[in-house]
Amino acid sequence: MTVDTKAQAVMSELSDHETMLHEVDMHASVPKSGLRADAILVDQEVPFGLDELFFSRTDTRGVIRAFNPVFLRVAGYGAEDMAGAPHKLVRHPDMPKGVFWLMWEGLKRGHSVGAYVKNRARDGRFYWVFAVVSPVDGGYLSVRLKPTSPLFATVKEVYARALERERGQGMTPEQSAKAIEADLIAAGFANYGVFQIEA
């Protein structure tokens, strides 16, 4: 099963969940009161259930156009703050830039991509997700769920090494992406694409 096939399966299940996507009127004036610039980091995980899926839709630049209540609750933002904000609003500094480089390369080629992502909530706590991001008309749809795979522990180790290389050796995102893929190959995966499928 490819990541694209997995993404289609997840999207077809969306109708089985009672989720209300909040559509953003991109012409409305949206106040961004209280957005964190550099919230302190808290070494505490935001709890959420295995049955809770996050949804968000962005334009091609990563600006949030729609989202569901689970995303708002776990990330700790109000709809007025999330609407029209860049998706990197929830990016955690522990995430290697190489992972995002791999994701964007796949998306630019028109493929769905999957990745483990550590996010930062508004209050500085963190939450891990497995994200499946797919190109849709005019942007991207991201569906995220709680990681449960045994590969999750391996991913944390790979990400820690990647982050150390980025910070200590000054690797560019592209160099880091290649090093991440090399680490995954050393762990027994043919390439990042195969890893996404098995993750």
Describe these PLM feature segments:
Residues 19-27:
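Intrinsically disordered, low-complexity N-terminal regulatory segments enriched in Ser/Pro/Thr/Gly
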Residues 26-35:
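N-terminal flexible/basic segments that precede or flank functional cores
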Residues 2-18, 34-164:
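Sensory/regulatory domains in signal-transduction proteins
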Residues 138-198:
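Sensory coupling linkers of modular signal transduction proteins
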